[in-house]
Regions:
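C-terminal helical subdomain
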Residues: 187-190, 206-237, 241, 248-250
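Residue(s) in the substrate-gating loop at a strand-loop-helix junction
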Residues: 148
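Alpha-helical segment proximal to the catalytic Tyr-Lys
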Residues: 133, 176-181, 239
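Conserved glycine-rich cofactor-binding loop
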Residues: 12, 17-21
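Active-site helix of classical SDR
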Residues: 128, 164, 172
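Substrate-binding pocket helix/loop in short-chain dehydrogenase/reductase
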Residues: 102-105, 109-114, 211
């Protein structure tokens, strides 16, 4: 059956940024499709809530409350999973945030810039490096890096975040070449998605309308939209796909001048 290609039965996945929003939905979606899931996020209570959902589905869940910029903590995560599982089928590098690097060139110092790079790019590289032996121990590994439309879209105040996400996309392509054929590496570049961190858009009618005006599908994306793309890339359904970045943005990438979208919304918010 064609649906069998999407099954994750017997697979083991590690998802960062799994406490809320996109990461949480990826984790629970994978469990719905049969995977055991290890969850990484900063807040234990958030992790516990997601883990409860996964266990109610009859799947195994491990939780790790840590900062992804802490290499020692990531090393501990991998060591624990090595002992518990011995192999890893899927790695989802989803953790990310603008961090201290949001702002103009005048305001963002080198230290603040590096904070954003560490959160969004260095942490993903570090965890991928540490988890490589586990991924190689699986019959076929799959890495999915969640970047952002801001990796290609030009918008003021996002020099650090945009650089980090563009770097993640290029890292995805290079590692796809380097790790083939035993490990596939792909990426997802979300557009504007409804999550706790973007709730302010939906709560302001003018801002919402200004934002969706530049999205051909006429709405914000939902965590399910990203989880479905992640499921495709993590499963055997994409067995001949590697080195690709899937833009899940409601068609925004097809339009010229999409930098206007965020600028209008932000201008209206400050008026």
């Amino acid at each position: 059956m064609i649906t069998d290609y999407f099954s994750l039965e017997g697979k083991r996945a590690l998802v960062t940024g799994a406490g809320k929003g996109i990461g949480a939905r990826i984790a629970t979606a994978f469990a719905e499709m049969g995977a055991d899931v290890a969850l990484v996020a900063r807040t234990q209570s958030d992790l516990d809530a997601v883990a409860t959902e996964i266990r109610q589905l009859g799947r195994e869940a491990h939780t790790f409350a840590c900062d992804v910029t802490d290499e020692a903590a990531l090393t501990s995560v991998v060591q624990t999973l090595t002992e518990a599982w011995g192999s890893l089928d899927i790695l989802i590098n989803n953790a990310g945030a603008p961090g201290q690097g949001y702002g103009s060139l005048k305001k963002v110092t080198k230290a603040r810039f590096e904070n954003t790079i560490d959160i969004n790019l260095t942490s993903a590289y570090t965890l991928t490096h540490l988890a490589l032996p586990l991924l190689k121990a699986a019959p076929q590994g799959s890495i999915v890096n969640v970047s952002s439309a801001l990796g290609w879209m030009v918008d003021r105040n996002f020099a650090a975040y945009g650089a980090a996400k563009a770097g993640m996309d290029q890292m995805t392509r290079i590692l796809a070449y380097e790790l083939a054929p035993s490990i596939r590496v792909n990426g997802i570049a979300p557009g504007a998605i409804e999550t706790p961190s973007t709730a302010f858009i939906s709560q302001n009618e003018d801002m919402y309308n200004a934002t969706v005006r530049w999205i051909p599908q006429g709405r914000l994306g939902k965590p399910d939209d990203i989880a479905l793309a992640a499921l495709y890339l993590a499963s055997n359904a994409s067995g001949f796909v590697s080195g690709k970045i899937i833009e899940v943005d409601g068609g925004m990438a097809a339009l010229p001048g999409t930098a206007i979208e965020a600028n209008i919304a932000r201008t209206m918010a400050t008026e």
